[in-house]
A protein has these predicted regions:
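Nucleic acid-machinery interaction/catalytic patches
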Residues: 1-542
Length: 542
C-alpha cells in the first residue's frame, strides 16, 4: 500500500478527488490513507475508496435484495411455471441453492439459455460446450451419463422436467426482480456490465488494488474500464510464484491478470520471499492452547504501544476469536478486530433458539403442556436467571418432582416467566414473542457505563442485530411475502442469525490487529502470528 500511495502521488499529484481506489475489501483503505498522507507536507485531496461490491452497487440502478425476500419471489415464479403444489416450507432451503446457481451463472457471464438447454435433445447439448471450460465440460459429461434413456427413473424424469423449465424460471425471475427494483448479487453485477456507459462514469480513474482471482464479470468490468483508459492496476504478488518456478499453481491467476492488465509497479518491487525471515513453528495440543500462547508472543514482540499496529494475529480458524479475545494480555492497550464476531457465539443466539424450541417442539397443543426438556433448557439460560429470581428454584422443583409435562400455569411465577411461558401460535405471534423477550434482555445493558468491556459491547450489539433481524422477518410476514410453518420459521431464524456477524467499533488504523486470512489482503505487518495453521484450515479444502 505504501508503494501504491507513492506511485499514485507521483503520477497524479495531490489532487486525487477525481480518482477512486477499489479494494477487494474495505480494510486496506484505512491504512492506504495513512501512507498517502505521508507523501507530502501539503494538503492532499484524498481519493474516494470502496470495495468492489460497493462499486457495483453504486453503479447499479437496482438494490441488493433481502435474501429472504429473494427466495419468496423465486417461489412465486417456481409455482407458476411448474404448477407445483410444493409449499414454501419445502421449497425455501433448496430455493437458496437455486439462487446461488443463478448467481454463479451471472457472475461468470454464462449464456443461461445454453446452460439450461433441453435435456431431451441431449446430443445438441453435449455438442455445444463452447461456453464451458475443460473441467466444467468433463463434470457435465460425467453427470449426464446418469441420464441415458435406458436408465431413467421417475425421479430422473421429474428432474429432467424441472431442468426443462429452469431457463424460463431464470428469465422470469430476473424480470420480476427488475420490476421490483431489486436483484441478487450476480444479477446486479451482470446488469452493470451490460448497461455500463464508460463516458458517464463519475471518476476519471479507477484504481484496482490487490485483487487475485477474478470471476468473468469482474474481468469484463476491468476490461471495459481499461479500454476507456479509465483504469490502473496494482497487483500484490511475489516473483517466486511468477518467474522462479514455471507454472507454479499459486501464481496461475496472478500471471493471467498481469498479462491482461499490466501492473503499474515494476517487478523489482515484488522480490521479497527470498529475503531472510525469522519463522518459528510452535505445536500445541489443542486450538485453545494456541490462543493461550498469545501473552508470551506479545511480550516477545511488543515493546511500546506505538508498535501495536505492527503486529497482527491471524486466525485461520475464525471460531478461535472468542478464546483469543480472552487471551490478549492487559499490556496491549488497543486492539482492532477486523472480522465480525459471529452472532451464533453470543448468549442471545442460544436464548432465541431455546425460546423457539420451547414454543414449537416443546409445547403440546393437544394436552396444553410443555415438555420438561425445553422448559429446563430455557430456565437454565443465564438471561432467564438474571431476569427472574424464580427461574433457578423453579427448575430445581421441576427436576425434584419429576414434572415431565408441566402446565403453563405452573410456570408463571413472575412477570417475566408469564411472558416466557405463555403459549404462542402462528408465525406473527412468534416474532412478537421474540422481540418482547429481546426488549426485556436489553434492560440488563441499560446502564452502558457499567458494561464498557468488549464483551458487553458485543452482547448489546448482538441484541440489536437480533431485534432488527426478527423485525425484518415480521415485515415480510405482514406483507404476505413470507408464509411458512412455525417449524420452518424456527429453522429460518436460526439460519439467518447463524449467518450474521456483529461489527466491532473502534479506530482501525491503531492497535494490534486481529483478523481472518482474507482480511490480510494488501496489508503488511512486522510481526504476525498465525493460529490454527493446520491441514483442513489453511486451505479449508483441496
Amino acid at each position: 500500500l505504501q508503494l501504491v500511495a507513492h506511485d499514485l502521488y507521483a503520477k497524479i499529484g495531490n489532487d486525487l478527488s477525481r480518482t477512486v481506489l477499489v479494494f477487494p475489501n474495505k480494510r486496506a483503505n484505512l491504512f492506504f490513507n495513512e501512507y498517502l498522507a505521508g507523501e507530502s507536507d501539503q494538503p492532499i485531496w484524498s481519493p474516494a475508496a470502496m470495495s468492489i461490491s460497493d462499486l457495483f452497487r453504486k453503479l447499479s440502478v437496482q438494490k441488493a435484495g433481502d435474501p429472504i425476500r429473494l427466495v419468496c419471489e423465486l417461489y412465486k415464479v417456481f409455482r407458476e411455471e411448474t404448477e407445483s403444489q410444493e409449499t414454501l416450507d419445502d421449497f425455501y432451503f433448496w430455493g437458496e441453492l437455486l439462487i446461488s446457481d443463478f448467481d454463479d451463472v451471472d457472475k461468470n457471464l454464462v449464456d443461461a439459455d445454453k446452460l439450461f438447454s433441453n435435456l431431451q435433445d441431449l446430443k445438441n447439448l453435449i455438442d455445444d460446450y463452447e461456453f464451458l471450460d475443460k473441467e466444467q465440460e468433463e463434470a457435465i459429461q460425467q453427470f449426464f451419463q446418469n441420464f441415458s434413456i435406458e436408465r431413467r427413473t421417475v425421479l430422473k424424469e421429474k428432474f429432467i422436467s424441472l431442468w426443462d423449465k429452469l431457463g424460463t424460471i431464470y428469465h422470469r425471475y430476473r424480470e420480476n426482480l427488475a420490476e421490483l427494483g431489486i436483484a441478487y448479487e450476480g444479477m446486479l453485477y451482470r446488469n452493470v456490465i451490460e448497461q455500463l456507459d464508460t463516458t458517464r462514469l463519475k471518476y476519471d480513474k479507477y484504481i484496482f488494488v490487490g485483487f487475485n482471482v477474478l470471476n468473468k464479470v469482474e474481468t469484463k468490468f476491468f476490461q471495459l474500464l481499461q479500454d476507456a483508459d479509465k483504469a490502473m492496476f496494482y497487483w500484490d504478488y511475489d516473483l517466486f510464484y511468477t518467474k522462479q518456478i514455471a507454472k507454479h499453481e499459486a501464481g496461475e491467476f496472478i500471471n493471467r491478470n498481469l498479462k491482461r492488465f499490466p501492473n503499474e509497479l515494476p517487478e523489482s518491487c515484488f522480490d521479497t520471499l527470498r529475503k531472510p525471515k525469522n519463522i518459528r513453528y510452535i505445536s500445541a495440543s489443542t486450538e485453545n492452547a494456541q490462543a493461550r500462547f498469545l501473552p508470551e508472543w506479545v511480550q516477545s514482540t511488543l515493546s511500546t504501544a506505538n508498535e501495536e499496529k505492527e503486529n497482527a494475529v491471524v486466525l485461520c480458524n475464525e471460531a478461535l476469536l472468542l478464546p483469543v479475545l480472552h487471551s490478549i494480555p492487559q499490556e496491549v492497550k488497543n486492539v482492532n478486530i477486523t472480522m465480525g464476531f459471529p452472532l451464533a457465539q453470543t448468549p442471545v443466539y442460544s436464548f432465541i433458539n431455546a425460546a423457539m424450541e420451547l414454543q414449537t417442539n416443546g409445547y403440546r397443543t393437544a394436552t396444553g403442556r410443555f415438555t420438561y426438556e425445553t422448559v429446563s433448557a430455557i430456565l437454565k439460560h443465564p438471561y432467564t436467571r438474571q431476569l427472574s429470581i424464580n427461574a433457578e428454584p423453579l427448575e430445581r422443583e421441576l427436576t425434584k418432582t419429576n414434572r415431565f409435562y408441566p402446565l403453563p400455569s405452573e410456570l408463571k411465577m413472575d412477570d417475566f416467566l408469564i411472558k416466557l411461558f405463555t403459549p404462542r401460535s402462528g408465525i406473527k405471534e412468534l416474532c412478537d414473542y421474540l422481540t418482547e423477550l429481546i426488549k426485556d434482555i436489553s434492560l440488563l445493558y441499560r446502564e452502558e457505563s457499567e458494561y464498557n468491556d468488549i464483551f458487553n459491547q458485543l452482547y448489546r450489539e448482538s441484541l440489536f442485530k437480533s431485534y432488527t433481524t426478527i423485525n425484518r422477518l415480521y415485515s415480510l410476514i405482514e406483507t404476505g411475502e413470507l408464509n411458512v410453518r412455525t417449524d420452518t420459521l424456527r429453522r429460518l431464524v436460526s439460519k439467518v442469525l447463524t449467518a450474521s456477524n456483529i461489527p466491532f467499533h473502534g479506530e482501525p488504523a491503531i492497535g494490534m490487529q486481529v483478523m481472518g486470512v482474507l482480511e490480510t489482503r494488501n496489508l503488511d505487518f512486522r510481526n504476525i502470528i498465525l493460529l490454527s495453521l493446520n491441514e483442513g484450515q489453511l486451505p479449508k479444502s483441496g
